[in-house]
Amino acid sequence: MTDNELVAKAKEALEYSYSPYSHFAVGAALLSTDGQVFTGCNIENSSFGATNCAERTAIFKAVSEGVKDFKAIAIVCSGDQPAYPCGICRQVMSEFFNPDTRIIVEEGGGLKTYTMSEILT
């Protein structure tokens, strides 16, 4: 799967975002090493601590189905700024991603790719 195809899957997931409080929709598409794609969106709650980010939704969906090896994740948002993983997502990602797992975001009209080790430094 190409990066553009993975981003397209993330954009599909963004459409399911439940974000009535922030109005900031996020979608993610997670590519496993065996080629499966798991999507997720952000799901807000009036108790903000109960909110789940798109990245964690996709990761938890994959892990709950027995998949724990990943190649890449694409993250998109409804705003003009790139959607970078928050601290909690980075912590969860560090549990399941290898240092070379790719994180793909839309930035400046194109795609920017980071590795897991790059976003942790």
Where would I find each of the regions flagged by the language model?
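Short solvent-exposed loop/turn micro-motifs enriched in small/polar/acidic residues
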Residues: 21-23
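Short beta-strand scaffold segments in enzyme catalytic cores
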Residues: 25-32
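Short, well-ordered amphipathic alpha-helical segments that serve as non-catalytic structural scaffolds
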Residues: 9-12, 54-62
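Compact, glycine-rich, soluble single-domain proteins
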Residues: 42-56
